[in-house]
Amino acid sequence: MRPLTFAFLTAVVLLFTSCHKHCNYHEGQQPSQTTIRIGALLSLTGSGSSTGQSSQVSIGFAQQDINAWLNSIGRNASVQLLIADTKTDTAEALKQLKIFYNQGIRLVIGPYSSAEVLAIKPFADTHGILVVSPSSVAVSLAIPGDNIFRFVSSDVIQGQAMSKLLVEDSIRVIVPIIRNDVWGNDLLGATSTNFTARGGVIYSPVKYDPKATAFGSELTQLDANVNTLLATYSPSQIAVYLCSFGEGTGILSSAGNYSHIKSVSWYGSSAFAQNGSLTADTAASGFAASHNLPCPIFGLDESARDKWGPLTDRITESIGRSPDVYALTAYDAVWVGLKTYLTTGTSADIATFKLAFTDEAANYFGASGNTTLDVNGDRAFGNYDFWALRQNPSGYLWQVTARYNSATGVLTRVINSTLVH
């Protein structure tokens, strides 16, 4: 292992000083055991693997940084992360959660997808497990009082952001192709509500099985739908709306073979933003770059740049690409969980632990910014960055092309790293 550099230590101190001054830890209330164990359900394989792999690295850094911090303040405790691969599969996620439960784990970071969260929710709710997903955004999972917390805002805001962009781009009708699960259907619902309210049209969504690996029939239907619309609208007024996980790369790789869908713009969604598989596929990345494909995702807080900047650099050095924002929300979730245990001890009942977690989240300002939760246990604040693929001399890279402020409803274009209203 390389020696810790002064710059690294400075970054860690900066990351937590602003939070620590607000925290009220009880000196006489040490955890009942020196090792605090936290579970992590990650999509290390399957269609969510791009996010899972970057999150695995980020929470590994969280464990390192936490233990260094605990040692620096003389605290007789350490954190240990137990990581399980859900394979981006609902049944596997539940299986692994039950294993964690039998191991005495009562705080779990993850899983990645809303479908997985939905699958494990009944068990978590009835067995006193707090689940903190860094990435689940389905609107229907915004439920007050349950044991599911989420470190991102629900897709209500994503629907607003996408609709704003579509209207400003003069798109009048969208033809969705979506993953047929709770996330895909909820996101389509949120976007449809906002887009139709702005005068837009949603035309004949094409839905596919989340386990599908070939998309010939879906692309044929999508192409036929666009062909029908071309009798009424110009190509510049029509867009394909892709709501996918990593399988979107396979869809884009084949899309160029269909004459009508390649004549219109494409728009993406949060689960595909910054996806690592897209840049590795020549056909898919070329199609994405030439057809726009802006993908909105929970945005970075500029006021937290001194925190997410160094962390992003560390993750990038480890995985060879820029991480998505969910790696940062996962990192922060581990920290808030640890600080909650320092406040409550490890034997607190679930109601006490949830209340303390909510308080700690409200007082924490980390790599992803302010982590205050709303009444549903979801992130209370959230702007969106739009990422799209752009070509440079070394290949294709994800770059921010626009930002949406949920408080003001303003969409700001980003051109050559300059904000343009």
Model-derived features: positions:
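C-terminal motif of bacterial Sec signal peptides marking the signal peptidase cleavage site
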Residues: 15-18
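Extracellular/periplasmic periplasmic-binding protein-like sensory domains
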Residues: 252-331, 344, 411-420
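Periplasmic-binding protein-like
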Residues: 40, 100-113, 132-134, 175-178, ...
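Short, solvent-exposed amphipathic alpha-helices that sit
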Residues: 51-69, 92, 158, 182-202, ...
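Bacterial signal peptide processing site
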Residues: 20-24
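Extracellular/periplasmic Venus flytrap/periplasmic-binding protein
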Residues: 138-140, 144-257, 301-306, 310
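Segments of small-molecule ligand-sensing domains
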Residues: 314-328, 338-400
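Beta-alpha junction/loop-to-helix N-cap segments that form part of ligand/metal-binding clefts
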Residues: 25-26, 31, 37, 50-57, ...
